[in-house]
A protein has these predicted regions:
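Structural signature of the two symmetry-related core transmembrane helices
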Residues: 50-64, 253-267
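Helix-loop junctions at membrane interfaces in 12-TM secondary transporters
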Residues: 67-78, 270-281
């Protein structure tokens, strides 16, 4: 709820310059890159559920205290704390899903997880915008309270599904796998490269896309907002059915097709100037999103050693954070350097390259039905 309005809060409430306020987003992104893998490693050591609980409670407390920070250094410190606490949740939650869901159902489970996230992201910014018009302090307070409530719910609910998951026992079983081992997994690193590239393309919807629509196609900000609504409605209505319908597909197929749909959807913007055409491109890359992201999480769950799922999910989370940190900046720079047409051809090339990296990094033998057989 707070993050989309952080720059607005810093400029209007605290009087920061736009450059200083914008730098806080970079601070948040850099912190996410660092703390995501830490959250994954902690999940392997103490269990995913404790990490999720601490992450939510600590994030809520930091949000309560955030308005007390008034100068640049204090705000930067609060932003690091906030990002550190919040971003440890993602790899822990992915590891938790992997632990409790059967291999043949993981892609659907990750799709349901994304459904919940998208519903929250559709409600949160709208509520945050309303609260920001009343009081920025109210916005921080409501976000803090809802986060604390989520942490409390996780703390008091008896999660029987986790009763058989003993991370310490898992650590004693099998070889110890540290960061150096992950770095020597060549296919895994190539896969992460594909994740970063397709993430850069995806996050253009936050930077180059709105600038292109408003400044070059002379469409209204309301039209850009409508595209978000279309994207969310498609995901809420179709992602789970699509993932269920393609459940027998190997992850490899979903990954490759998803990357190509991103490449086509964003690349076609260089050839289209009409509102209807723009809507069509959003539909195309949204279908890519619905295929790609559940399959990426499922592939991570499939290849990660049982006693290091958190570490692998942390590396995956870090890759997405890298994309989020550099993607919007890269898009705006390319838009200024190459112009409003060629920037989208670059995005097509990046998406196609990501698909090729998926071909190299996900061999045919690592297919979802193989994982089912191994897990049965």
């Amino acid at each position: 709820m707070v993050l989309p309005f952080l720059v607005l809060y810093l400029t209007r409430e605290l009087g920061f310059s736009l450059a200083r306020a914008g730098s806080m987003l970079a601070v948040y992104g850099a912190s996410a890159i660092v703390f995501g893998p830490i959250g994954g490693r902690l999940s392997d050591r103490i269990g995913a559920l404790p990490v999720m609980r601490v992450s939510l409670v600590a994030s809520g407390l930091v949000l309560l205290l955030f308005p007390l920070a008034k100068n640049f250094a204090a705000v930067a410190a609060m932003t690091v704390l906030w990002a550190g606490c919040a971003e440890m949740f993602r790899p822990a939650s992915l590891a938790a899903i992997t632990h409790v869901v059967a291999p043949e159902q993981r892609r659907q489970a990750f799709a349901l997880n994304r459904l919940a996230i998208n519903l929250g992201m559709s409600i949160g910014p709208a509520l945050g915008g309303f609260l920001a018009t009343v009081s920025f302090h109210a916005m921080f307070a409501v976000d803090a309270v809802t986060t604390l409530l989520a942490g409390t719910l996780l703390a008091i609910t008896p999660w029987r599904a986790f009763s058989g998951v003993n991370s310490e026992a898992a650590n004693r079983q099998g070889p110890r796998i540290g960061p150096a081992t992950i770095l020597h997994d060549g296919r895994f690193l190539v896969f992460l490269g594909g994740v970063i590239l397709v993430g850069i393309v995806f996050f253009q919807h936050e930077s180059a896309l709105p600038l292109y629509l408003v400044q070059y196609l002379h469409l209204s900000p309301a039209f850009y907002g409508m595209l978000f609504t279309i994207n969310t409605l498609l995901i809420v209505g179709l992602e789970v059915p699509i993932v269920s319908a393609t459940a027998q597909w190997p992850n490899r197929r979903s990954l490759i097709i998803g990357c190509f749909l991103f490449a086509i959807g964003f690349g076609a913007l260089g050839l289209i100037a009409s509102p209807a055409g723009v809507i069509a491109t959003v539909v195309v890359w949204t279908f890519g999103e619905m295929l790609l992201f559940p399959a990426m999480s499922a592939h991570m769950a499939e290849i990660a050693p049982e006693n290091r799922r958190g570490a692998y999910m942390g590396a995956y989370s870090m890759s997405l954070s890298i994309s989020l940190t550099i993607g919007p900046w890269m898009g705006t720079q390319l838009l200024a350097l190459l112009g409003p047409v060629r920037v989208w051809f670059v995005m097509f090339a990046l998406g196609a390259l990501a698909a090729q990296l998926m071909v190299f990094s996900v061999p045919r033998r690592r297919q979802s039905h193989v994982a089912v057989a191994a897990g049965s």
